[in-house]
Design a protein with these regions (language model features):
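Short, well-structured N-terminal submotif of metal-dependent ribonuclease cores
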Residues: 1-37, 50-63, 116, 127-129
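Acidic, PIN/NYN-like endoribonuclease modules and their adjacent C-terminal/linker elements
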Residues: 1-2, 71, 100-129
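Conserved glycosyltransferase catalytic-site signature
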Residues: 7, 39, 96-100
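Acidic catalytic patch
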Residues: 67-89
Length: 129
């Protein structure tokens, strides 16, 4: 089962934000679960540590994406086109629309996020943490 990871679940994991980190780790450790973020999630995770000059946290994120994640989904034209449709129909923010489109195009089964507003989207199962 492929789990698309929005940036928030990754941030919770790396920063050990409880009780979220334990719940996320438990879900992702289940047999057959493949976590799949996109390049957008990688970007979003890296901004705050970079802005704050927190090299240790930035390295933790870089290590996670390099060593724990087997695949980072690229944002190509098909993702952007679907994101445009999602944004037009649901009026979500552009990053949220890109995340949802990436999850659908990459054939993920579940979209993991902390954003309850995204539950309105019907193109994939949304799991809110």
């Amino acid at each position: 089962m492929r789990y698309y990871l929005d940036a928030a679940p990754i941030i919770y994991l790396i920063e050990q934000s409880q009780p979220f980190a334990t719940a996320i780790r438990s879900k992702l450790a289940a047999p057959g679960i493949v976590p799949l973020p996109s390049e957008l999630a990688r970007l979003e995770c890296r901004v705050k540590p970079m802005r704050d000059g927190n090299q240790a946290l930035l390295q933790d994120f870089d290590d996670y994406f390099a060593n724990t994640i087997a695949e980072i989904f690229p944002l190509k034209r098909d993702v952007v086109d679907l994101a445009t449709e999602i944004r037009a129909q649901y009026n979500f923010k552009t990053p949220d629309s890109l995340h949802l489109a990436a999850a659908v195009i990459s054939n993920c089964d579940i979209f993991m996020t902390n954003d309850q507003r995204l539950n309105r989207y019907t193109g994939i199962i949304i799991e809110t943490i």
